């Protein structure tokens, strides 16, 4: 689906370890939520079947397909209104983070074996890689308020090394780490931080001649 209708000259892929390749105790079903209403589009149905074979039969029911998004669909499709008016992929967050409200999630780490990787997620990551690497693929790790354990990025570093893919890592950049003015919470930049990071990222991309 990635290259079916449009072939980008460059693909910047935001690496999020917990989403892209770390093991989770929670079900994969949570990732299917926003795809339900697009189920009939080419290639979407096979993702559902891959997560859970019974989805093939559950999705035969229109009630099941839309039971969690009925109100949104009513607003968008029948009333002609959009719940995302004016948003084109970027929603600015205003205000600085409150360090008193920080709750850091636990990553899938085993003290004897290290981080636990998810073979299911890794398969999808490699599938994406094979399709996208010919389109000037660049992996990017955005700044975080927390200091990130560098070991958690080892799989991506290995993938980039083996496939000759650039990796731009801002996760532990001292300009951003623990700098409250750039963050809305521990993992999301606020509007000021997003503007600053955009500038810094463009500088790095130009250094690597990413757009030539």
Where are these regions (language model features)?
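Conserved SGNH/GDSL esterase-like catalytic core that processes O-acyl groups on lipids
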Residues: 1-34
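Loop/turn elements at helix/coil->beta-strand transitions in domains of secreted/extracellular proteins
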Residues: 7-10, 133-138, 165
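Active-site-proximal beta-strand/loop segments in catalytic clefts of secreted hydrolases
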Residues: 14-16, 141-144, 170-173, 190
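Secreted/periplasmic serine-hydrolase-like ester/acetyl group-modifying domain
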Residues: 15, 28-135
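Extracytoplasmic/secreted cell-surface and envelope-processing proteins
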Residues: 19-28, 148-150, 177-180
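Extracytoplasmic/secreted proteins, especially bacterial periplasmic and envelope-associated proteins
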Residues: 34, 43, 59, 124-127, ...
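Acidic-and-aromatic substrate-binding clefts and catalytic sites of carbohydrate-active enzymes
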Residues: 115-119, 145-152
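C-terminal regions of proteins
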Residues: 153-212
């Amino acid at each position: 689906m990635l290259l079916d209708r449009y072939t980008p000259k460059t693909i910047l892929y935001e690496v999020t370890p917990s989403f892209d390749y770390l093991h989770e105790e929670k079900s994969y079903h949570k990732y299917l939520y926003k795809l339900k209403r697009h189920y009939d589009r080419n290639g979407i149905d096979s993702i559902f079947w891959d997560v859970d074979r019974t989805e093939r039969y559950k999705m035969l029911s229109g009630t099941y397909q839309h039971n969690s998004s009925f109100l949104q669909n009513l607003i968008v499709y029948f009333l002609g209104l959009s719940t995302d008016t004016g948003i084109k992929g970027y929603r600015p967050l205003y205000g600085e983070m409150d360090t008193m409200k920080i709750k850091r999630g636990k990553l899938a780490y085993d003290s004897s074996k290290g981080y636990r990787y998810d073979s299911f997620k890794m398969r999808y990551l490699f599938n994406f890689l094979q399709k996208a690497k010919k389109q000037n693929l660049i992996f990017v790790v955005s700044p975080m308020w927390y200091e990130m354990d560098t070991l958690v990025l080892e799989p991506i570093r290995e993938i980039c090394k083996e496939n000759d893919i650039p990796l731009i890592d801002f996760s532990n950049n001292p300009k951003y780490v623990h700098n409250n003015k750039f963050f809305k919470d521990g993992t999301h930049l606020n509007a000021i931080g997003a503007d600053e990071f955009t500038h810094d990222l463009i500088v790095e991309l130009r250094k690597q001649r990413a757009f030539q």
